[in-house]
Each structure stands twice: as structure tokens, then as C-alpha cells.
Amino acid sequence: IQCVQKQLGISFAEMVELAKASTYTRIFDVNAARFSAPQDMRAEIKAALAETGEAPATDADLINSIYHSLAYCYGEAFRELETLIGQHWDKLYIAGGGAKNATLNELTAHYTGKQVVALPIEATAIGNLKIQMSIPEGGTV
């Protein structure tokens, strides 16, 4: 999402507003190798979507597809994790900058079937600091 945001030259808040205006919800595999470092992320995503059906017609459609695809991927990963370790959770905690994206959090709740709890953006730094403070001097994690 950051690559597309930079390519478009708009804020994340503007991206959310564009996504809300779109009804295009096609999903692509966000973990596909082709998305690791393409020359043009927008073009690569559009090409991937065109290969499996209809490509997004607008930037709003592209952004909405990205959000749906990320949330779908989170759902797949969460279900796989639950299966692998034999545990079930009702909540998914989101920390860091992404926690501010209410639209992505709503989609994540939809695709995971979990309650999404958005932690304050500072939670990532606080958790990191807590871990570092618990390591004895000269020790390792």
C-alpha cells in the first residue's frame, strides 16, 4: 500500500476516502513474488487483476482492491495459524501505523471473522521498549 501511496502522491487518509467510494472488491494474492519489488506497483497489481478477470478502472478501485486483498490475506493467515497451533482467538490486535486505518480494520474483521482491536500507534514502540528493558545487560533475546 505504501508503494501505491507514493506513486499516487496522496495521503493515506485520501486513499481511504477513495477506497470508500469504490465498489470494486476483486482480490489478488498480496504475497505473490511479483509484488516484492516491481518497477511499477500500480501497473503490476492491475496486470494481476486483469489476468484473473476485470482490471480496476480507477485508482479508487485499485486501492479498494488492495485493502480487500490485504484483509483477505490476514484472514487466511489467521485461520492457518489457528489450525497449526490448535488454538482459537476471538480478537485480532493491530498495532502500529496501520491501526489508524479504520477501513482496513473493518475489512480485516470481515475477512477474519474476528473482533479487531486497534491499539494506539505508540503500542509498537512501547512493546519494543518493554522487551529491550527486560533483556539483561549484555544478553540476547
Can you describe what each PLM-predicted range is?
Residues 97:
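Glycine- and other small-residue-rich loops at beta-strand/loop junctions that grip anionic moieties
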Residues 126:
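A domain-level signal for the structural core that forms small-molecule/cofactor-binding pockets
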